[in-house]
C-alpha cells in the first residue's frame, strides 16, 4: 500500500505514484520489502529479519534512517510483540510489518487526525503517538493495582504482597 502525503493521507496505486513520484508512506511485508525499498529509493544492505527484532532502535545509514520497533501487545504484555522496520529517506517512509498493526495504526490516523501527514515528520509523529496512546490507560490500571496493594500493606495484609508484586514488576519492565 502507498499513502501519498498531504493534509489527508491518500492511498494511491503504484502506477499513480510512479507518475507523480510524490513523497509517500509505503506499507509492505518482509516478503516484498526489498522491492518496495527499491521503488522508494532506499538502499539497505542488511538482511530484513522481522523475527529477530528484540527492541526499539534507530540508526543512521548513508542514505536513510532505519528503525526497528518491538512493541508489547497490551493484552499480553509478557508474551508476543508487534515487530516492524521503518525506513526514512529524504522523501519517503517505508514500513515493513508482517502483521496488520501498522495498517490499523494508519487507519486510526486517517479516522482520528485532522492533519494526517502533510510531511513525513508529521506522519512519523502521528504514527508513534498512535501506538503510545493507550500507554497512559495501562499505567493508570497498574497504579490502581499498586494502590490496592498499598492499602493491604497498611492493614497488615502482607502475606501475598511479594507474589502479587513480582508479576507487576515484570510486566512494567516489558512496557
Question: Could you tell me what each predicted segment is?
Answer:
Residues 1-114, 145:
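Helix-boundary and N-terminal cytosolic regulatory elements
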Residues 69-175:
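Extended amphipathic alpha-helical scaffolding segments in membrane-proximal extra-membrane regions
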Amino acid at each position: 500500500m502507498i499513502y501519498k502525503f498531504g493534509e489527508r493521507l491518500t492511498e494511491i496505486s503504484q502506477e499513480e505514484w510512479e507518475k507523480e513520484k510524490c513523497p509517500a508512506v509505503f506499507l509492505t511485508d518482509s516478503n516484498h520489502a526489498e522491492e518496495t525499498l527499491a521503488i522508494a529509493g532506499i538502499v539497505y544492505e542488511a538482511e530484513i529479519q522481522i523475527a529477530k527484532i528484540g527492541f526499539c532502535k534507530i540508526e543512521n545509514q548513508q542514505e536513510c534512517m532505519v528503525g526497528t520497533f518491538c512493541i508489547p501487545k497490551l493484552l499480553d504484555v509478557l508474551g508476543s510483540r508487534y515487530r516492524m522496520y521503518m525506513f526514512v529517506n529524504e522523501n519517503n517512509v517505508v514500513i515493513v510489518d508482517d502483521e496488520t498493526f501498522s495498517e490499523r495504526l494508519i487507519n486510526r490516523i486517517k479516522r482520528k487526525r485532522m492533519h494526517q501527514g502533510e510531511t513525513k515528520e508529521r506522519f512519523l509523529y502521528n504514527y508513534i503517538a498512535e501506538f503510545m496512546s493507550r500507554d497512559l490507560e495501562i499505567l493508570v490500571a497498574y497504579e490502581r493495582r499498586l494502590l490496592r496493594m498499598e492499602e493491604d500493606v497498611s492493614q497488615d495484609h502482607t502475606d501475598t504482597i511479594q507474589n502479587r508484586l513480582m508479576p507487576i514488576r515484570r510486566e512494567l519492565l516489558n512496557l
